[in-house]
Swiss-Prot record:
One of its GO terms (biological process) is base-excision repair. This is Putative 3-methyladenine DNA glycosylase. Keywords: DNA damage, DNA repair, Hydrolase. Pfam families: Pur_DNA_glyco. Belongs to the DNA glycosylase MPG family. One of its GO terms (molecular function) is alkylbase DNA N-glycosylase activity.
């Protein structure tokens, strides 16, 4: 595996989202190394995207989104589930890619179909918020043998409040992969 470097994340959010598919999310939590293949993502395009957290402006919660690309943005939803995002583009944009589902590769026994489930299975929590994804214990890597697949584009899940942004085709997943989240 080859760890992705900062320039990968500093590009257009939609391009980064599509190119994250098939990559490996790696987390060594001090006990064991967990690896999952990214099979589903959603792109959030910055302050003008009404479904994006940064659309409300710079806050303590969203500060990481406005920082350098290649950092993790991890937040709690419904008071019980963590969601993991990858910050993209240049500083000040406020864009990110939500990791929605993983295919288990190593040391993952729990379900990974959905952002909360994958975070639980990978032991991702608020301690990893603002973590540099170029670290040695939490990163995304290119697999040694990439595989070909077809990318499906659909509207994002659970963003009906985002007006015209609710129907944008910004959810991407690997066609026919059994680990994509259920809608």
């Amino acid at each position: 595996m080859r760890k992705l470097l900062r320039p990968f994340y500093e590009r257009d959010t939609v391009l980064v989202a599509k190119e994250l598919l098939g990559k490996y999310l790696v987390h060594h939590d001090g006990l064991e190394e967990k690896i999952g293949r990214i099979v589903e993502v959603e792109a959030y395009l910055g302050q003008h995207d009404l479904a994006c957290h940064s659309s409300k402006g710079l806050t303590k919660r969203t500060k990481v989104m406005f920082g350098p690309a290649g950092y993790a943005y991890v937040y709690l939803i419904y008071g019980m589930y963590y969601c993991m995002n990858v910050v993209t583009e240049k500083e000040g944009i406020g864009s990110a890619v939500l990791i929605r589902a993983l295919e288990p590769i190593k040391n993952i026994q729990d379900r990974t179909q959905g952002p909360g489930l994958l975070s639980k299975a990978m032991r991702i929590d608020s301690k990893l918020n603002h973590r540099d994804l170029l670290s040695n214990d939490f990163y995304i890597a290119e697999p040694n043998s990439p595989t070909d697949f077809t990318i499906i584009e659909k509207p994002r899940i659970g963003v009906h409040y985002a007006k015209e942004w609710a129907n944008e085709l910004l959810r991407f997943y690997i066609k026919d992969n059994p680990y994509i989240s259920k809608t």
